[in-house]
Amino acid sequence: MANREEKRNLETIPVGSLGIISLPGCKPLGEKVDQYLVKWRAERESEHKESLAFAGYQRDSYLLDAKVPRFGSGEAKGQILESVRGTDLYLLVDVLNYSMTYSLCGNENHMSPDDHYQDLKRIIAAVGGKARRITVIMPFLYESRQHKRSSRESLDCALALQELVSMGVDNIITFDAHDPRVQNAIPLHGFETVQPAYQFIKGLLRNVKDLQLDSNHMMVISPDEGGMGRAIYVANVLGLDMGMFYKRRDYTRIVNGRNPIVAHEFLGTSVEGKDMIIIDDMISSGESMLEVAAALKERKANKIFVFSTFGLFTNGLDKFDKAYENDIIDKVLTTNLIYQTPELLQREWYINCDMSKYIAYIIDTLNHDSSISDLLNPNERIQNIVAKYKKGEL
C-alpha cells in the first residue's frame, strides 16, 4: 500500500502547506503521526519538489504550536503560536481523555468530553478563517451515542457536527462511528468513518499463534443488533460464519437512563470448540461484552478474542482481570485512538492496536487531494496478512 500511496501522491500538488494541531489530550498520537509524515516526505523523491507548489513540503515537524490556557475561573481561550495562513490544517482531538485536568477556583477538575469539544472550537476560532482548509480528526465522535431521539431528547451529535461545519470545518474524519447515519446532519460536507478491521486482524495474528482461520474452527460474533455491519464485514473477509446476540430489555423500568437488559439471546450456528471473535465499536463498562463471552463459554466455545475500537473501561479493569483468570476471555484488542491507562497497557490479556500509521496515510493522501477509497477498504491488505500467517511468515 505504501508504494501505491507514494506514486499517487506524487502525481498531485498539495492543497496547501501541511499543518497538524494536536490538542492537549491527543499529543502522543499526534507525535507518532508526525514522525511517519516527516520520514515519508524526507524519503520521497519528485522532480516537482523544488517548485513553489511544494514549498514547506519537507519539514522537521508538521506539528504547529497551539495551547488552550485557562483563567482561574476555569474559562479558557485558544492560542495558536505560529502562522496558519494558507495551511491545510488537521486538528486531532481525543474527547475521551479524562486524564487531563485544569484548575477551577483552586480545585483540580478532570476534563470531560464537553471540555475537549469546547477546546476544539476555541482552536478553530483562533484560526480565524486563515487556513486554506480545516479537517477535524476526531477518532471517537463527540456525543456519537446520542445519535437518535427517543421522546424529548436533544440530538447532541447532529448539533455538534452542524456547529463545526458552521465554523468553517471542511471535513470530519472519525473512526467506527456509533451510527454513521449521523452524517445526515451535514449532507453537503465531508464526513468519513474509518474502520480499524485490518489493524485488529493484524494485532491478533501477530500475537496469537496456531489459529485456524476457517469456518470450522472460528466464528465472528456481534454482541448486539447494532454492530451487525462490523461483524458481517470481518466474517466475509476472513471467510467465517457469523452469529449475534440480541438484548432482551425490560421496557417497564429505566435504570441509569436506559431500559435494563434482562438477557442476551443468541442467534447462530453451534459455537462448540470454535474460537470466537466478538467485535463491537466500544467497551464502556464492559459488562455486556463479558456477559456475551460467558454465554459463549456456556455453549462450549474455545478461545474468545474481543475486538473493540474504543476501550473506555469506565468501571475499571477488575472484571476483565477476573474474566481472564476464569478463562472467559483470552485477549482484548482496542486501539490507541483514545486515552489508555498505564495499567491497561500492562495487562497480559490486552493487545494495543496502533492506528497512527493509518492516520498518517489518510492525512498524507488528503493533503494531496487524492482519493482515500483504497485506505477505507482494507480487504486486499487483510488477505495479504492472512496469507502470510498461514504460510508462517508473520
Predicted regions and their residues:
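PRPP-associated nucleotide enzymes
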Residues: M1-L394
